[in-house]
């Protein structure tokens, strides 16, 4: 069985031993399950949202980056109209018949996601076809680093390479993933997760024009100014929070409607203040205030990166985290307000950061559950990992690097 070239693995992962073993395992299982003697290999990373919390779905701006955890796949066309995917660690095979795509046939789970993506690809003018795949991931599931978007971008890369001559853009990838989540999962997600996983590296995104998303890569790494990103899984997963996620864009769009526009990026905070007393939903007002402040902070953060002003950059991330906690209110769910794993872990982290006099922390990604992000001095990384592990377990603490390469066909 063919395997990816070591030079390509070195380029993506910065090493070949661990990654080589992962792809060897992938190849062996793919051959064993599907009887194939050749394969093509693909990778799509998870993502970290650095600043721009819950702004993408209302046309705002985000700085995000792909991370050094990824979903990998061995795949090959099977000459039919049936997609068959085996995911490492899961007993049931994912089977999707391309001749029977409908939400009534695929109602839940990963099969629904794949079916939705195929329908989304077709509706956007792209070809689909049957293939077999064996996939494996080390992206933390249901924790806010976009395990689902990583999987989606892997599948997009597969169908792009096999059936579309690699002509799909990252924007196309994101639309396909968003369609599947919106229509088949009833989740009102934006496109940030998909774009960050697809593009790779640290990136500034502008979501004002959904059909022509603008993005620019940033010359940035936390190590460049002596810090390290640590993702902490707080102990409660994202699996049952679709309503909470959907309420945020819904409430923001309701405010936008009062202001005479469709999305908040089309208006400004002055218009909100002028109409504030007409809006009965106080939380919606607070969330709109977060949007305007957060979009401005993203612009300032990009400027700080450009001028190597990392003190200002960290200050803006700190402000962003406070706004998410106080205005956006996505650190815990009102359905179970006694369980506050996010706020608990933030508070414990703040005690550590105050003691050392450096670093910031914030809720990470969609929120309500899952992970927080702590940005700590490199010299304090081990101390922080040891400290926070007392409360969440060392297996839930992940020092991260930003990976330069996004969703790609490896060879």
Model region roles, listed by residue range:
Residues 66-67, 145-165, 373-376:
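DPxDG-like acidic metal-binding loop motif
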Residues 61-79, 199:
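Structural signature of FAD isoalloxazine-binding scaffolds in flavoprotein oxidoreductases
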